[in-house]
Amino acid sequence: MKVIFNADDFGLTRGVNDGIVHAHLDGVVRSTTMMVGMPAEAHAVELANHLPELKVGLHLRFTAGRPLTEEQNLVGRDGDFTPYGQFWHRRDYDPIAIHNEAVAQVEYFLALGLNLSHIDSHHHAHTHPQFEPVIYDIARTYQVPLRSTGLAGEEEFGCRYHFTDHFYDKRVGHDSLIQHLLTLKEHYDVVEVMCHPAIVDTALEACSGYAKQRELELAILTSDELKLSLRKHDIEVTDYSELIFAPLHSCV
């Protein structure tokens, strides 16, 4: 089995960026997804330009910050995106507004000069029932993989692919992660593990309730123990290009 450790939130803060780079250079992270239009975006681009082996995708925003478009259907009275707590209860989203904002973010990303590796979203927003079909079509248009939460699978990628958010919050731990991967190994060719490594800074503490845990993630993702365990169990670290170039019926 192969595993993709994808680090979310690239571009959120400089501490997040530095943590992701550390997890890439000294750990198992080979893929990340960037939030455009966020405070540390320029810093993230500068870092990415010096890391040719780090695959960078787009972390679509629909629950954080302000949109790149003027689509009023996506925001509250303050002009910010609908907060996370309210986002999932809404069923009045306009698919045209969703499409326009998502395309604007993709085009903004491409204008930065980066190669688009794949697409996912902050807070899994693309899995909202009104967002899912729109974002899926956009991913197909740009011919890049979309983080799977049941929409795309073996027929889409040509292999048995599975996404897991197990490595998060109270479940962050070496033993828990390895045991989880071993249960998946019997059924899948490629598993994507969502992760959030970071070096906590004041900006992160101010904007996210998930802060200190990110440093624990970073410690595990860069540990010799994890690298040894993956080799012991014949689990190979890869990146999203594994899905792009997957031959029919097999990724191994």
UniProtKB/Swiss-Prot annotation:
Its cofactor is Mg(2+). Keywords: Carbohydrate metabolism, Hydrolase, Magnesium, Metal-binding. Its EC number is 3.5.1.-. It is an enzyme of class 3 (hydrolase). GO terms for biological process: polysaccharide catabolic process. GO terms for molecular function: deacetylase activity; hydrolase activity, acting on carbon-nitrogen (but not peptide) bonds, in linear amides; metal ion binding. Mg(2+) binds at H59, H122. The keyword Transcription regulation does not apply. InterPro entries: COD_ChbG_bac, Glyco_hydro/deAcase_b/a-brl, YdjC-like. Belongs to the YdjC deacetylase family. Homodimer. Probably catalyzes the deacetylation of acetylated carbohydrates an important step in the degradation of oligosaccharides. This is Carbohydrate deacetylase. It comes from Vibrio vulnificus (strain CMCP6).
